[in-house]
């Protein structure tokens, strides 16, 4: 009788271990961590690994150090707009081209060009905003540039008309769906 009880207890313990393992697999974390691996694998005896001698590098030729390549700083590329689209330019000049320090006329030292996808109904084009930078020939510390026009969505390249077109198109699709849903419910 006690032998039957012991075998039933062993079987019960085995079944509880299986249920616990399956519950862990079903409801536990979904990544491959030590808890999801068979617990007997973690108890492998690898011996004393600290007694392994280090390999001698006597017969290895010394590596000649060449010039290190400079790492370029990562540059953002949010994508170039297609070249086949027509472009128009918008030139934004500073309010004054007179140097605030010495009152001489400023000369152009560079430009910043940004592009945004603009849409006029049935015409898609690229709007180029050009902002020249001006500097004084007498004093090299002053650079004047008109402030950039505000973007609709952060650093995106979408013009306000393009965004308005997308929103109007999305609203039109939504209204069409609501009309269809309403008419199908009215027929019931």
Swiss-Prot record:
Keywords: Plasmid. It holds the Pfam family zf-IS66. InterPro entries: Transposase-related, Transposase_TnpC_homeodom, Znf_dom_IS66. Residues 57-80 are annotated as: Disordered. It comes from the Bacteria. Belongs to the transposase 25 family. This is Uncharacterized protein y4aQ. It comes from Sinorhizobium fredii (strain NBRC 101917 / NGR234).
């Amino acid at each position: 009788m006690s032998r039957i009880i012991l075998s039933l207890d062993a079987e019960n313990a085995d079944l509880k271990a299986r249920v616990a393992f399956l519950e862990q697999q079903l409801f536990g974390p979904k990544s491959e961590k030590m808890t999801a691996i068979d617990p007997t694998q973690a108890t492998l005896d690898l011996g004393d690994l600290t007694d392994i001698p280090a390999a001698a590098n006597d017969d290895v030729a010394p590596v000649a150090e060449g010039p290190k390549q400079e790492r370029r700083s990562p540059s953002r590329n949010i994508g170039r707009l297609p070249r086949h689209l027509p472009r128009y330019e918008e030139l934004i000049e500073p309010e004054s081209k007179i140097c605030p320090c010495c009152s001489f006329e400023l000369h152009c030292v560079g430009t910043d060009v940004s592009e945004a996808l603009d849409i006029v109904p049935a015409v898609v084009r690229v709007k180029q905003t050009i902002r020249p930078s001006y500097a004084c020939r007498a004093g090299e510390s002053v650079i004047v540039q008109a402030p950039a026009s505000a973007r609709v969505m952060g650093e995106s390249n979408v013009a306000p008309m393009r965004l308005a077109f997308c929103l109007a198109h999305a609203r039109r699709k939504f209204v069409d769906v609501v009309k269809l849903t309403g008419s199908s419910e009215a027929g019931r």
